[in-house]
Amino acid sequence: MIVLADHHDRQFRYLRLSLTDVCNFRCGYCLPKGQQLDPQRPALLTLPEIRHLIEGFVALGIEKVRLTGGEPTLRSDLVDIVRAVAAVPGIRRVALTSNGWNLRDRLADLQAAGLTQLNLSLDSLDAARFQAITGSSRFEAVMAALEQAIALRLPILKVNAVLLKTLNYPQLSDFVEFVRDRPISIRFIELMQTLDNHDYFQQEFLSGSVLTEQWLAQGWQPIKRDRTAGPAQEYCHPNYQGKLGIIAPYSPNFCQNCNRLRVTSRGALRLCLFGTGEFDLRPWLQHPDQRSQLLEQVQQTLNFKTAGHQLAEANSGDTRNLATYGG
């Protein structure tokens, strides 16, 4: 089997596919200026195009697909997309990242269609603080989706919280206590600077090392990562059912274990979340007979993947916000 690899000896088995660039939340760290979309932008990838895309990437060794947004539940055909992706031979895991606003009543259908992992964005366990961060009053709906996911016993259930120095770090102990009796993983993501959130970043950035130092002192132990795992380092504790984790893009050598590629909701391959430029794959997603051309295009494009991002130098590439690419 072909395994995608770049010039930096990194293998890629994980694809993040954005299903839409539209989001119905207005998180300060992501869309501080609101969402400004080009009305003339191309249409979203269709279900047949998505199927051709996944089949092509599986032929290149991809084993895990994460469906992101924007907010992917805004797609009315989401269940059909999950079913199509899960049906491709070679796919070991189908994951979904969602803000959970309209997820609870769709979870059973998504699980039946083949969803094996859910990552729910939840930046606070307090309704008022949640609204202050996200601009949404749907806290109860998100919590209901989380409890439903626990009840359905999804194989992998994770909560993502962007680490914010003044807005949720003071409630860190609440998150830790939340996993004591719940079989979920809560991962804190270091706030990343984009072209739109400079002031917010300056106010709210906090290094993830602050958390890991506390956890290690409290007896939490690091867990070995799977080869298709995302960038999080997770920790377990004998007194807790759940896990804690940190995604620290500002840490040294963060990019040396990169194992994922991104495709936008319009069919463009993006080599790095904080890179520049995209490579349009859509012309090779129209018919199965184009498979060899698609594979060749992906392999050639991978030659342009750099060794790492330049976030530490305050260089966000051309990324205005994270909603466009799904983070």
Swiss-Prot record:
One of its GO terms (biological process) is Mo-molybdopterin cofactor biosynthetic process. SUPFAM superfamilies: Radical SAM enzymes. It catalyses: GTP + AH2 + S-adenosyl-L-methionine = (8S)-3',8-cyclo-7,8-dihydroguanosine 5'-triphosphate + 5'-deoxyadenosine + L-methionine + A + H(+). Keywords: 4Fe-4S, GTP-binding, Iron, Iron-sulfur, Lyase, Metal-binding, Molybdenum cofactor biosynthesis, Nucleotide-binding, S-adenosyl-L-methionine. The keyword Lipid biosynthesis does not apply. SMART domains: Elp3. Belongs to the radical SAM superfamily. MoaA family. Catalyzes the cyclization of GTP to (8S)-3',8-cyclo-7,8-dihydroguanosine 5'-triphosphate. This is GTP 3',8-cyclase. It comes from Synechococcus sp. (strain ATCC 27144 / PCC 6301 / SAUG 1402/1).
